[in-house]
Swiss-Prot record:
This is Polygalacturonase. It is an enzyme of class 3 (hydrolase). One of its GO terms (molecular function) is polygalacturonase activity. Transmembrane segments: none annotated. Its EC number is 3.2.1.15. PbH1 repeats lie at residues 95-117, 165-195, 196-217, 218-238, 247-268, 276-298, 310-355. It catalyses: (1,4-alpha-D-galacturonosyl)n+m + H2O = (1,4-alpha-D-galacturonosyl)n + (1,4-alpha-D-galacturonosyl)m. Pfam families: Glyco_hydro_28. Residues 1-19 form the signal peptide.
Length: 371
């Protein structure tokens, strides 16, 4: 081949290679899409691009008023990391402020990270009973085979965690709503669990103005190493009046409850149906309790006791052991109010609650228990 033809062929091939190469902006786009770790500084971008990332870093997110930090339907195995301070704009609405769902998801916090809901903007002493409409904080619904660990949460407007999941572990989470003690915090439950199987909560610190944990339905639930203060104590219920009204195989153990209305509590709904079975409260220390050290009652209606128990939600195979400590002088140490034949197969041992009063209004106390 003549030399001028060889030069022409090589020039043509080189031009084709240059034209086939991506432009610099295209290379950048490809790099972003192939990256497994995505760092977001806005809620909208995190929600829009969540499916492209195996690790999502939420860096100093400011969630707009009336919007949810929506990380639902994450791809399996995604890790979510809260970094810096996460904040939320103010609006009267029902929320939630955060919702996360998926399978095999890990949710955790970087060192020093805080999720600050600044609930004082909504607090008015009414909670969910009236006044301002307040957003729920965190929906862990369909967050299955997953883990939430190390979150540091401040001042939720009302309830913190709503849990409807299977095989979920929550470890080392702090919910600090103590500012609400003097500023109108109300109904600031720590963990509300319903329609769930296999939930484990370990080493939680909850400072609030309602239940530390409330199990309304579900099975195979384990709460251990909890530190609860300021609220309504460790609760089963209220059970009854919902789509699912069964609580089964629950253990609440190795925890402390201080400066709260109740120590441990089971409450079922008046004239409702359902069941509570295989529940264990063990090795719990109480102090500074203002209402009841232990309270088990089957008379709730519209969120308040009626004084008249019914038998539609039996409480069976209950173990209460190693519940110790003190209540205030005008509080009741133990109160049991059961419907006819509605409480049976109870084991009661090592209960030593002092400094309060003995109730004369207990009814149908089952064999083995004392009131």
């Amino acid at each position: 081949m003549p030399s001028y033809l060889r030069n022409l062929v090589w020039a043509t091939l080189a031009a084709g290679l240059v034209s086939a190469a991506p432009t610099p902006s295209r290379v950048s786009d490809l790099t972003k899409k192939s990256s497994s770790t995505c760092t977001f500084s806005s809620a909208a971008s995190a929600s829009a691009s969540k499916s492209s990332c195996s690790t999502i870093v939420l860096s100093n997110i400011e969630v707009p008023a009336g919007k949810t930090l929506d990380l639902t339907d994450l791809k399996d195995g995604t890790k979510v990391i809260f970094e810096g301070t996460t904040t939320f704009g103010y609006k009267e609405w029902s929320g939630p402020l955060i919702k996360i769902s998926g399978s095999d998801i890990t949710v955790e916090a970087a060192d020093g990270a805080v999720i600050n809901a600044d609930g004082s903007r909504w607090w008015d002493g009414e909670g969910t009973n009236g006044g301002k409409t307040k957003p729920k904080f965190f929906y862990a619904h369909s967050l299955d085979d997953s883990t939430i660990s190390g979150l540091n949460i401040k001042n939720t407007p009302v309830q913190a965690f709503s849990i409807q999941s299977d095989n979920l572990i929550i470890d080392g989470v702090t919910i600090d709503n103590s500012d609400g003690d003097e500023n109108g915090g109300h109904n600031t439950d720590g963990f509300d669990i319903s329609e769930s199987t296999g939930v484990t909560i370990r080493n939680a610190v909850v400072k609030n103005q309602d239940d530390c944990i409330a199990i309304n339905s579900g099975q195979n639930i384990y709460f251990t190493g909890g530190t609860c203060s300021g609220g309504h104590g460790l609760s089963i219920g209220s059970v009854g009046g919902r789509d699912d009204n069964t609580v089964k195989n629950v253990t609440i153990t190795d925890s402390t409850v201080t400066d709260s209305a109740n120590g441990v509590r089971i409450k079922t709904v008046y004239d409702a149906t359902g069941s509570v079975s295989d529940v264990t409260f063990s090795d719990i220390t109480v102090s500074g309790i203002t209402d009841y050290g232990i309270v088990i009652e089957q008379d709730y209606e519209n969120g308040s006791p009626t004084g008249t128990p019914t038998s539609g939600v039996p409480i069976t195979d209950l173990t209460v052991k190693g519940i110790t400590g003190s209540v205030e002088s005008d509080a009741v140490e133990v109160y049991i109010l059961c419907g006819d034949d509605a409480c049976s197969d109870w084991t009661w041992s090592g209960v030593d609650i002092t400094s309060g009063q003995t109730s004369s209004k207990c009814e149908n106390v089952p064999s083995g228990a004392s009131c």
